[in-house]
Swiss-Prot record:
InterPro entries given in the database record: Extradiol_dOase_DODA (IPR014436), Xdiol_dOase_suB (IPR004183)
Organism: Arabidopsis thaliana (Mouse-ear cress)
Function summary: Opens the cyclic ring of caffealdehyde between carbons 2 and 3 or between carbons 4 and 5. Involved in the biosynthesis of arabidopyrones.
GO MF, one annotated term: ferrous iron binding
Cofactor needs: Zn(2+)
Domain of life: Eukaryota
Protein name: Extradiol ring-cleavage dioxygenase
Disruption phenotype: Deficient in arabidopyrones.
PANTHER family to which the protein is assigned, alphabetical: 4,5-DOPA DIOXYGENASE EXTRADIOL-LIKE PROTEIN (PTHR30096:SF0)
Tissue expression profile of the protein: Expressed in seedlings, roots, leaves, stems and flowers.
Length: 269
């Protein structure tokens, strides 16, 4: 079994990523196995911002159905399917680790839920064959960054078991501030300032500051009125380890305020 020495945070942006070839981020995700991770993982654990539960939950299904959890988008998007196999054993292993290593009293199993668009849209571009078993893990927006970082620490050993750990969220996420007049891919100043702070903090290894982003970051509440789109980042940071080296693997913008900044975290050997 080949170990996976990296974890990843992916900004999944708008659901239109699934069909809009003009988006730079779409080309980035489509080039994943050529440019980012040629190694094929045994299975994938994806932490998506779009599954928010009171207690940690994993989906344990034989096959993942495709959840179209968005409205008002072009009809072809609702016909897209990404029915990758489930990863029941991985889900049970995640539950075991969160309780044993993470000290969590309760972790739920969902035997019906498939993949929401935070998971299937990027994965459909990255691994279009849909032949890798996938388990999804929820976030808890009633908790904080350190909680999710510690959740990731509890899951770190999965990398040694050939599991690719992906957090899918967004470096900035304020849907009320999207500017449909900006069509040239340029960002507005407040969003860029937050995005640069996040980039610099990660690349300099200041993970403690990122855990306390609500107090430390400029324009924190503007960039993330709600925290759920950043919490997948904390999980993959924790899973990579405190000595992990961060690298920005993509950056682009949509509608002025939506950052596609994405990062890898390479664990120290």
């Amino acid at each position: 079994m080949e170990k996976v020495n990296q974890t990843f945070f992916l900004s999944h942006g708008s659901p239109t990523l699934s069909i809009d070839d003009s988006l730079e981020a779409r080309q980035f995700f489509k080039s994943w196995t050529q440019k980012v991770l040629p190694q094929k993982p045994k299975s994938i654990l994806v932490i998506s911002a779009h599954w928010d539960t009171k207690f940690p939950s994993v989906n344990t299904v034989l096959r993942n159905n495709t959840i179209h959890d968005f409205s008002g988008f072009p009809d072809p998007m609702y016909k897209l399917k990404y029915e990758a196999p489930g990863a029941i054993e991985l889900g049970k292993r995640v539950k075991e680790l969160l309780m044993k290593e993470g000290g969590m009293k309760r972790v739920d199993e969902d035997t019906k839920r498939g993949l929401d668009h935070g998971a299937w849209v990027p994965l459909m571009l990255m691994y279009p064959e849909a032949d890798i078993p996938i388990c999804q893990l929820s976030v808890q927006s009633n908790q904080n960054g350190s909680y999710h970082y510690n959740m990731g620490k509890a899951l770190a050993s999965l990398k040694d078991e050939g599991v690719l750990i992906i957090g899918s969220g967004s470096a900035t996420h304020n849907l009320r501030k999207l500017d449909f007049n900006i069509t040239d891919g340029s960002p507005v100043p407040w969003a860029l300032e937050f995005d640069h702070w996040l980039r610099d903090s990660l690349l300099q290894g200041r993970y403690g500051d990122v855990n306390e982003w609500e107090e430390k970051a400029p324009n924190a509440k503007m960039a993330h009125p709600w925290p759920e789109h950043l919490y997948p980042l904390h999980v993959v940071m924790g899973a990579a380890g405190g000595d992990a080296k961060a690298e920005q693997i993509h950056t682009s913008w949509q509608l002025g305020t939506l950052s596609y900044s994405s990062y890898s975290f390479t664990s120290s050997l």
